[in-house]
A protein has these predicted regions:
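Short pre-active-site segment immediately N-terminal to the catalytic Zn-binding motif
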Residues: 177-195
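Active-site recognition of the HExxH zinc-binding catalytic motif
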Residues: 190-210, 344
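A short mid-domain helix/strand-loop element embedded in enzyme catalytic domains
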Residues: 163-178, 249-267
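N-terminal low-complexity, Ser/Thr- and acidic-residue-enriched intrinsically disordered segments
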Residues: 1-72
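Long amphipathic alpha-helical segments used for membrane anchoring, targeting, substrate engagement
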Residues: 1-33, 108-134, 384-412, 436-437
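Auxiliary, metal-adjacent structural segments of Zn-dependent hydrolase domains
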Residues: 58-175
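Pan-zinc metallopeptidase signature
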Residues: 262-438
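Post-HExxH zinc-binding segment in Zn-dependent metallohydrolases
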Residues: 137-158, 206-258, 272-299
Length: 438
């Protein structure tokens, strides 16, 4: 922050001080965050979508929903469509970002206050409140920069795998879609339709799996809150970083927040929440990848190229996702998308569409991270048994009636009995023992 000749930029300095003094609720000043995000978006042209673009999005989503009817047991979850500018994406998703960001903001403000020595807290008095407000404004500036960067890249409302928009609203960002299409050897219409298929598939899943939205957002907030965090380790880290920080100097406060404040050792609870989030994100994205692949297999020649482009984009992330990862402390990208897509496809091949989609009935039924290690083996033992001929059935029945049972089992044996046990034997009896007297 500086003006001509190395002099401070007084307008910017006074603007920061004024923002700190403005009252706001919660741990983060969202007015500052949104203002920062809008300014970041305004650095490049951001025209409002034309009526033609709005109609194109609506038509693409309508066709996408029709194609998806043949590939999933879930009915349409789309109740409205929208073509957003980048600024409109900010407005349309900010309420969910508040849910995601505020826990980590509150943790940060509280940790900074508690990191001060007891004597310093007693001597600071009202200054502690000012420090908290200053940190809230600095965090808001970082959040705004991160959201502004994301707004310049996102393609749809569900592009990061989380339900960021209103329930049932399928939204695309035409300006970003066109920029994405420019780097592919695929027509813009095909790119729009493919992305509409993905958006409509997300909407179906979130609409008809009622627990999924809270499950995903809950994993994010559980991570952000740092459940069972090592308070001593964090306090030591913050105390180390706060040495030399002048609460009256906005630049020193900014350096504190940019100096790896969020790069702290993860607690076991945070590691568990992160694994749950990454696995569920991969399962959501893998399911979308699978059903869209089915829907386009015989209808869209460019689908394979689009699928690979989207997979690479989601797996690698970009500058915007890196910015947000450094801000919140986690990455919203499905690292195991390919494994998850393979798992869903294998389950459909063996047991059918309804069995594949039925896994979403309850979170306890979802594949685990270990299941993604062997995607072809998920529920392998639940595959439909091979048909048996009438003659084979008669032969097996004859063996049973003749007492020709495998391994020396006797009629009336219970699961876990040893060969040669007598009816009524108790666990631990020796072979040949009779019933244990009462």
């Amino acid at each position: 922050m500086g003006g001509p000749g190395g002099m401070p930029d007084l307008n910017q300095l006074f603007g920061q001080i004024q923002a700190m003094m403005q009252p706001y609720d919660g741990p983060l000043n969202w007015d500052v965050a949104l203002d920062t995000a809008r300014k970041a978006v305004a650095q490049q042209p951001d025209p409002s979508p034309t009526q033609r673009q709005k109609d194109a999005v609506a038509d693409a989503v309508r066709l996408a929903d029709h194609w998806l009817d043949d590939t999933t047991a879930f009915p349409s979850g789309v109740t409205s469509t929208a073509a957003w500018s980048r600024a409109e994406w900010l407005v349309g998703t900010v309420e969910v970002w508040k849910v995601l960001v505020e826990p980590v903001a509150k943790q940060t403000v509280d940790s900074l206050s508690s990191a001060l020595p007891e004597e310093a807290r007693a001597a600071s008095g009202p200054l502690l409140g000012i420090i908290g407000k200053a940190v809230g404004v600095m965090l808001a500036s970082q959040v705004g920069s991160g959201l502004g960067a994301l707004a310049s890249e996102v393609l749809t409302a569900s592009d990061v795998g989380l339900p960021l928009g209103a329930a049932g609203r399928a939204a695309l960002v035409p300006a970003n879609v066109e920029a994405f299409a420019a780097g592919l050897d695929v027509s813009t219409d095909d790119v729009l339709l493919y992305l509409a298929l993905r958006e409509a598939a997300h909407q179906r899943l979130f609409a008809h799996v009622p627990w999924l939205r809270e499950h995903l957002l809950g994993a994010v907030t559980a991570y952000a809150r740092g459940i069972e965090i090592n308070a001593e380790a964090i306090q030591s880290r913050i105390e180390e970083q706060m040495r030399g920080v002048d609460p009256t100097d906005p630049e020193s406060m900014q350096r504190l927040l940019e100096g790896g404040l969020f790069d702290m050792p993860k607690s076991p609870a945070q590691e568990a929440a992160l694994l749950r989030l990454e696995t569920t994100l991969a399962l959501v994205e893998g399911w979308v990848d699978e059903v869209v692949g089915q829907a386009t297999a015989e209808r869209m020649p460019a689908a394979a190229k689009m699928q690979e482009a989207v997979r690479r984009r989601r797996a690698a992330g970009g500058p915007a996702e890196d910015t947000f990862a450094s801000l919140v402390g986690l990455e919203l990208r499905p690292r195991r998308l390919r494994d998850a897509s393979t798992l869903w496809g294998s389950l459909r091949t063996r047991q059918g569409t309804e069995a594949r989609d039925g896994v979403w009935m309850h979170p306890d039924l979802l594949p685990s991270a270990a299941d993604l290690d062997d995607p072809l083996g998920f529920r392998e033992d639940a595959a439909a048994p091979a048909e048996i001929s009438e003659s084979d059935f008669d032969a097996e029945l004859a063996k049973l009636l003749d007492g020709d049972l495998p391994d020396g089992d006797q009629p009336g044996d219970q699961p876990g009995d040893q060969p040669g046990d007598q009816p009524g034997d108790q666990p631990g009896d020796q072979p040949g023992d009779g019933p244990t007297p009462a």
